Amino acid sequence: MSDVDIFHAPRDFEFHDFDTRNVTASDGGTATLRFPRLDADAVHALAASVRRHRAEKLARYSTDGIVDVIARAVELWTDPEYPERRLAERLIPAVTGYDASMVRIELKRYMRMFRRRELLRFVDDE
């Protein structure tokens, strides 16, 4: 393993200060988890960036279009061979102390809640 960013922000948004945490997985691999150090200014700037992206891009999508994008991402995460899922299955137990088999089961169960038909049910309920 190596350095792993454990955050997500709009592509054009840049964090300036980071913290790290070194973890060792049960297989002996190590990783440095990197995450932004947030202060009020960073949170306000990030919120403004998210609002701008919503107005410029997301607002153009239909509800079905948004559901489709989320459903495609969920399909990736339900695949046990998806590289990001495999990485999560190695790192989450090291960070949380949860048993690796429970993490695998719960990731699968959790992701299934966001498949297309379930998302459409959520939307219909709202």
What are these regions (language model features)?
Residues M1-E126:
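N-terminal Rossmann-like NAD(P)+-binding subdomain of aldehyde/semialdehyde dehydrogenases
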